[in-house]
Amino acid sequence: MKNLLFILAVAALLGAQASPAAAHSALLNCFDNADGTFTCQGGYSDGSSATGIRIVVRDSSGIVLQEARLDSNSEVTLNRPQGDFSVLFDGGAGHSVEVRGDSLVR
């Protein structure tokens, strides 16, 4: 019986380490302010702060138009480029998300 309890305890510990609940995804929402600017709010699915995360605005050919970092509220307001563009939340490997300019919430 003690061996069974030991095996179950070890299995539970190993299962907890491999749990997908420990993972988190990058989130980015961008809103058109209707004044020539847009605001993006970033974060992680587990509620972690995104303060200081790099935001990159690129045109349709990949040329960087603007770069900024999320403030202490995990937000940034930028000038809206003319033409097609995208906004990249650059949280590092596996933690990046991109929003197309034509999908900004108005």
Mark where each language-model region is.
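Short beta-strand/loop motifs in extracellular/secreted proteins, especially
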Residues: 51-53, 85
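C-terminal segment of classical bacterial N-terminal signal peptides
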Residues: 13-21
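Short, aromatic- and glycine-rich surface loops/edge beta-strands on solvent-exposed regions
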Residues: 83-97
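Positively charged n-region of N-terminal signal peptides that target proteins for export
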Residues: 1-6
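Glycine-centered loop-to-beta-strand initiation motif
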Residues: 69-78
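A short beta-turn/strand-edge loop motif at beta-sheet boundaries
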Residues: 46-50
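Short amphipathic beta-strand segments in non-cytosolic proteins
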Residues: 54-67
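Beta-strand-rich domain onsets/edges
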Residues: 20-38, 43, 61, 100-105
